[in-house]
Design a protein with these regions (language model features):
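C-terminal "post-core" interaction segments
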Residues: 1-119
Length: 119
């Protein structure tokens, strides 16, 4: 038995999140204390199968569909709760994804503390 974490969590995602990481994002998005931040994920994750065509080419495809709680197919990716510009911060002092996530967590924690004081 482990520890149950109920504090705010931010999961950073981009188009490089696919397959099992896409499934992880889906499961995390369903939790009330989690916000997904970034750009739409790369999708996939529906039990990938591989096969070889008669000409020798290899193909890989999802053998099943995966749906979110609303019934939407996630094969083409998951849209984050907080969508950021798809930008690379090469040479920048501050990574825009990390900065946005830190700001979100700070605001979120302050809201929680404010509600606790009122109780």
């Amino acid at each position: 038995v482990g520890t149950i974490w109920l504090k705010p969590v931010v999961v950073l995602v981009n188009q490089g999140v696919y397959s099992a990481a896409n499934d992880f994002t889906l499961r995390m998005k369903g939790l009330p204390q989690v916000k997904i931040v970034g750009v739409k994920t790369g999708g996939g994750g529906g039990l990938p199968m591989s096969s070889e065509l008669p000409n020798g080419w290899a193909v890989r495809f999802s053998s099943s569909r995966t749906y979110d709680a609303d019934g939407a197919d996630i094969e083409q990716g998951i849209t984050p709760d907080v969508v950021l510009k798809d930008e690379i911060a090469r040479g920048a002092e501050v990574d825009p994804y990390i900065e946005a996530s830190a700001n979100l967590l700070t605001r979120w924690i302050l809201q929680i503390k404010s509600k606790q004081k009122k109780q």
